Amino acid sequence: MNIVARKLHTSYNRSMKVNLLHDWQVTINQAFDIQKRLARQVSRNNEIITTPRFIAGVDISVDKAQGLGTGAVVVVGYPKLSIVETRIVQDKLEFPYIPGLLSFRESPLILAACQKLEVTPDLIMVDGQGIAHPRRVGIASHLGLLLNTPTIGCAKSLLCGSHETPDEKVASYTEIVDRGEVIGAALRTKEGAQPIFVSIGHKVDLKSAIYWVLQCCRGYRLPEPTRFAHLAAGGNIKEISPTAQAARNVVQLNLL
């Protein structure tokens, strides 16, 4: 079956550059092969600058009835975590929903949103998996490679592997292990709430990933960058900031 994913229009390119690591017009089997190749390119070493100035969160929402996706990127200033910029794009989702291949379905929207940024983030937190993925390259790793930027996977659910339940105290965590390999951490970010699943995306180690997620938590289960992006992608822009509406930029993509 020949499933075609979108190509981004090159005019949507201001601050962030996208590495052309592969074609987006691929079959499912080709997507698997691309993931296996990209997994070897993921850096598990920390390359986050000592004090990031800007941290971005990205997420996507889906209107299943219309097959429409809304991708959002919200950039915050560190350490106050106040919103600096919000970009949102909407378009039809061409690639099917296949667990483990969500990056081929969702990444084009996120990339288009990132390409419209005026501010370049030093770190991106992704609502999804990094190397905590069967082929060790979830959407956080995929985006990190494409954007050549440190990324962290901050998932709300576990895709693969197993872990012990972390203690109830905030900052407690247990390792996620799959086939004998540590691929992430089940991290308690809020007392009384389920842990989130943190993993290396690209250009970061697990210890640093956990540290920065905790630095960006402000009493909610999710770190502020991905929490804001989740709200923005769902159309709840006013919930994240009274002035965020002015920063909203909804674009109907022109696709090749």
Description of each model-found segment:
Residues 53-63:
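Two-metal-ion RNase H-like nuclease active-site motif
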Residues 110-141, 147-149:
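Catalytic-site beta-strand/loop segments enriched in glycine and acidic/polar residues
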